[in-house]
């Protein structure tokens, strides 16, 4: 276990957006908003344990031998290392493809909703109260970079171009940008045509094209200059999108959300095709929470009820596997063995490339 990291004073505060939050971090609505991009409004999170503003010092995440089996909302690669984040400030890392996990020392007990690494050392995690954590040692130790308790707005996703430049998205149209690795964060929500302050659930890079943001009420935004300017995209669907993945060819975008809705574009969002998802002949209606394009080119999308979708043709078609435990899933990466590492309602699990359980001796 690493030594406790030093406390760093949060830099700045986010200005209020046009939709003022009317909830506190303990309410069911707050938990719903923080999970909306990953668990299709499942109300799975335990109450967020916010630190009292009057309490001195730092409340570190409680060490638990069961952390790898509790709610985890996202997982990412830090080079060959895997890093997962979730409930009560838990951040775990694995150096053996997910077979074993070590809990990092983390200066919060807030619910963490997303984690992202720009390289094998520099990473960020975001969560409740606009909390942003940073690491420069591959996830072993973490420091707080930003927080806005007054706003009580959960951040829902984070993406970095490199070790210096990145964005965090969140509820009520929050969009934060840093150009110095997280030392300072600027509210740049006014770059978006989002006057209603719709929730921004996910952000991703579309290789060869730019950045793409998806959110509630069919919200879609794209940037061809790495976030300096943004254009609103005409959406093929007016429900909520929870995730977006770039394909293997320039311009390919796969966006997905409520009730099994999944759409594919080959021209960076100018036009869209609805992708039919079937379960024994019936339309898939599970909420789709997160996705990833693996090193071998497969696109994997996971969601409610143990849904695992896999595509070997850059998102033109998907095969469905419903995990027998029906536990909801919120994140996926591949490991060196070609298997999938899933996170969600029951923590972390290594499964076969299709999503099926591995033989006992391989788990």
Q: Which residue ranges define each predicted feature?
A:
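Residue-level detector of bioactive/disordered segments in secreted/extracellular proteins
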Residues: 9-13, 25, 38
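Bacterial N-terminal signal peptides
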Residues: 34-44
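Acidic, Ala/Val/Gly-enriched low-complexity intrinsically disordered segments
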Residues: 3-5, 11-14, 30
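Residue-level hotspots at or immediately adjacent to binding/recognition sites across diverse folds
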Residues: 7, 49-363
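Bacterial N-terminal signal peptides that target proteins for export
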Residues: 20-36
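Short stretches within intrinsically disordered, low-complexity N-terminal or propeptide regions
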Residues: 16, 32, 47-50, 168
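Short, Lys/Arg-enriched N-terminal segments with co-localized hydrophobic residues
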Residues: 13-21
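Short, intrinsically disordered, low-complexity terminal segments
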Residues: 11, 27, 42-47
């Amino acid at each position: 276990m690493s030594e406790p990291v030093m406390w760093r004073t949060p830099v700045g505060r986010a200005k209020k957006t046009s939709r003022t939050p009317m909830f506190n971090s303990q309410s069911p609505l707050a938990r719903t908003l923080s999970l909306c991009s990953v668990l299709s409004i499942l109300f799975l999170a335990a109450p967020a344990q916010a630190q009292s503003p009057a309490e001195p010092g730092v409340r570190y995440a409680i060490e638990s031998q069961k952390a790898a089996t509790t709610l985890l909302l996202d997982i990412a690669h830090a080079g060959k290392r895997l890093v997962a984040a979730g409930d009560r400030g838990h951040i775990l890392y694995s150096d053996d493809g997910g077979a074993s996990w070590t809990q990092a020392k983390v200066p919060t007990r807030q619910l963490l909703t997303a984690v992202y690494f720009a390289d094998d050392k520099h990473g960020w995690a975001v969560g409740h109260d606009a909390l942003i954590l940073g690491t420069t040692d591959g996830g072993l130790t973490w420091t707080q970079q930003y927080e806005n308790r007054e706003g009580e707005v959960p951040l829902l996703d984070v993406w970095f171009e490199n070790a210096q430049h990145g964005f965090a998205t969140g509820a009520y149209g929050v969009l934060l940008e840093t150009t110095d690795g997280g030392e300072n964060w600027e509210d740049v929500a006014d770059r978006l045509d989002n006057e209603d302050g719709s929730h921004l659930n996910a952000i991703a890079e579309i290789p060869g094209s730019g950045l793409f943001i998806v959110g509630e009420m069919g919200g879609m935004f794209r940037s061809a200059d790495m976030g300096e300017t943004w254009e609103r995209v005409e959406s093929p669907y007016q429900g909520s999108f929870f995730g977006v993945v770039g394909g293997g060819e320039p311009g390919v975008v796969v966006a997905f959300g409520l009730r099994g809705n999944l759409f594919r574009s080959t021209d960076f969002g100018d036009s869209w095709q609805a992708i039919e998802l079937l379960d024994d002949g019936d339309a898939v209606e599970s909420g789709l929470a997160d996705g990833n394009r693996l090193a071998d080119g497969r696109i994997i999308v996971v969601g409610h009820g143990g849904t695992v979708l896999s595509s070997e043709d850059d998102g033109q078609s998907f095969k469905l596997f419903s995990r027998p435990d029906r536990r909801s899933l919120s994140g996926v990466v591949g490991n060196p063995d070609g298997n999938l590492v899933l996170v969600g309602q029951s923590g972390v699990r290594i499964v076969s490339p299709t999503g099926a359980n591995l033989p006992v001796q391989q788990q």
